[in-house]
Amino acid sequence: VIPEEYRVEYVADRTITTSKIMMGLTIECARCHTHKYDPISHNEFFSLYSFFNNVDEKGQIPYGVTAPIPNMTIRKLDTENELSFVNLPDSLDNITLMVMKESENLRKTYVLNRGRYDSPTTEVKPKTPKVVLPFDETKYSDNRYGLSQWFFDSENPLTSRVAVNRIWQQFFGIGIVSTPDDFGSQGSKPFNPKLLDWLAY
């Protein structure tokens, strides 16, 4: 296993999976070339990829960061009545949080020619596909937190529709859009667009 190739594959997988889950878009084509059917460029794939490029990837993910022990002030009367469980022995010594944090050494992101890990070309900054909603650098930070804010911005036309469609699919066996991972031009059209919009907003 070539460590850099492994890392690049996992970052690409996170990018593709996030795109399908949150936006209902199949962007994997844009890893090697501009998307053939949807208006997503090769550069836009790697701009989205750059949000995940600074996550530490060690191959073996250790247990999370230990959470600090809470410090609370509780009156004696509280412990005798409503909070009697406070006097019970702790069931866990430590609580771990599974948090993926940014790498300490930030790496630059490059467009990879034909998606190959060993063929970097031009540098790109974190951005999202313009066709969905342009990434406003004054409104969002250029990390995964900023990306999450972008996903849940009320102006984003896809996140809520994709989520509602998946919930509908769980209840009724088929989504309002029958291709839940593809809201792009090759996916199915919603059988009731007004219902999808109404449920999403």
Show which residues each predicted segment covers.
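Sequence context surrounding c-type heme c attachment/ligation sites in exported
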Residues: 1-78
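Primarily short, surface-exposed interaction patches in extracytoplasmic proteins
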Residues: 8-11, 38-41, 72-201
